[in-house]
Amino acid sequence: MIRILLIGQDHTTAERLGLQCLERGIGVVIAENVCEGVRVLATTPVSLIVADLSRLRLGAHDQAAIFDRAAPGVRVAVTIPTQSPIEARVALELAGFQVVSSPVTPDELLKPLA
């Protein structure tokens, strides 16, 4: 079963995205912040991690290292506002994150998993 971990998404986005995923038979786990998300990863296998940029407190490479230690090989997508500077997008992509503009749809997230 495909399962997605949503980290730090606002309530409306998490609910909308969660319901859209459930309609497609995709499980959803929700964490308020990265620390809670890492704790979830210790006990729950996921296929994809989706984190809101505003919840990432470390630099892109350090944050990528934490996710890689907690869930090796699991793809991490970072949602960012559409008006974010290109430099922020590039830094995240160079660290290995998939960068998607908010609001995100399940199809955007799941395309690389297919």
For every predicted segment, state its role.
Residues S47-A70, I80-A88:
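Conserved phosphotransfer microenvironments
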Residues A91-V100:
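As written
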Residues Q9, T79-Q83, P103:
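Conserved active-site segment of CheY-like receiver
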Residues D10-I30:
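Two-component/phosphorelay signaling modules centered on CheY-like receiver
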Residues V104-L113:
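C-terminal output helix
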Residues E32-L48, L56:
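Acidic, metal-coordinating helix/loop segments flanking the phosphotransfer/catalytic sites
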